[in-house]
Each structure stands twice: as C-alpha cells, then as structure tokens.
C-alpha cells in the first residue's frame, strides 16, 4: 500500500517456491485476483526425511555447477540448453545452510492453510501428469475444494514453463484477463 499497490492481478509460484506464495496469500491485506501454482509444490514430507534428503539434494545441485550442467538430465527430466545456465548458477551460489533451512521450512507434513472459498475459485493448481508429485494432487483438492485443477497431460514437473516460456506467459495472461484456462490441447480438466 505504501508504494501505491492496491491489488495484485496474479500471484505465480512454482515448485517449492509455492510455500512463500501460499504464506503471502494467507497473510496479505491486498486483494489478489488470481493465483497459479505450477508443479509438485505441495509435497508433504516428514521432517526426518527432509533432513536426510538435504545432503543428497545439495550434492545434486552442486554437481550441476561442477559439471557445467552435464548432470542435469540425471537429476531432472530434461537437459535443455536454455535452462542449463539457471541451474549452473543455482549450483554455484547454493550454500548448504540455505538449502537446509529452505528444505526444513518447506514441504512440511502439516495441514494446508485455509483460504476463503472466493479466493479458491480463482486459484489454479496445475500438475503435470508424469511428475512424481502428481500423487499430492488429491490432498490439495481436498484442502481447497473450490480451486481449479488442470492437468498438463504428458508433462513433467514445470516442463511447460521451461520448454515454452512464451506460451506459459500467454496462458497466465489469459487466466488474469478471462478468469479461466485457455483451450490448450494438452490440458485435462
């Protein structure tokens, strides 16, 4: 408000970054017209498992830097040259302490925060049909029964936005302008 912002047309979050967006949605006083969550951000993993996975995830991300992106296909579903620089930079800048804190503060095995039904009607929780975290979709649907749950058929975690950033941006603009998903051939509703 102090900077003249009266409302937000859309909040967009991907993967485990969605924890921050969900916290924002539950705490902000600004009206939010739409939200779009892409991927398996709602995985609920016990604290002990998150602690055990941290060193392995750290080494996996660091290996992307050490190998100049050569290990990307072994870690993720793709090795697109267009996204390698982002993962290489992430691997270079990652510290174990920051990753440990982030993992312990996200993916928590606890109830989802409540959201007003009216806001739920304007939230899109997208999952790719081939991503590992597709199994969490039912839990999200139970927590937010008024939400929208498109499935990107044949897509993996965050694959559409990585492979077609322009198409992804156009889809978000369509949602913000028309309050519905565009007709895309790979969307299962």
Model-derived segments and spans:
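Conserved acidic catalytic loop of the alpha/beta-hydrolase fold
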Residues: 1-9
């Amino acid at each position: 408000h102090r900077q003249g912002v009266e409302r937000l047309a859309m909040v967009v979050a991907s993967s485990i970054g969605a924890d921050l967006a969900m916290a924002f949605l539950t705490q902000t006083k600004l009206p939010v017209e739409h939200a779009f969550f892409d991927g398996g951000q709602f995985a609920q993993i016990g604290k002990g498992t998150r602690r055990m996975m941290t060193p392995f995830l750290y080494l996996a991300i660091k290996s992307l830097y050490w190998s100049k992106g050569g290990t990307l296909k072994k870690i993720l579903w793709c090795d697109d040259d267009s996204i390698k620089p982002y993962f290489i930079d992430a691997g270079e800048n990652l510290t174990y302490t920051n990753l440990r804190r982030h993992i312990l503060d996200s993916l928590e095995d606890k109830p989802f925060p409540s959201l007003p039904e009216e806001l739920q009607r304007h939230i899109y929780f997208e999952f790719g049909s081939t991503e590992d975290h597709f199994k969490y979709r039912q839990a999200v649907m139970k927590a937010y029964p008024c939400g929208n749950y498109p499935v990107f058929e044949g897509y993996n975690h965050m694959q559409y936005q990585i492979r077609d950033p322009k198409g992804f941006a156009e889809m978000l603009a369509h949602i913000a302008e028309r309050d519905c998903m565009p007709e895309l051939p790979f969307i299962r509703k």
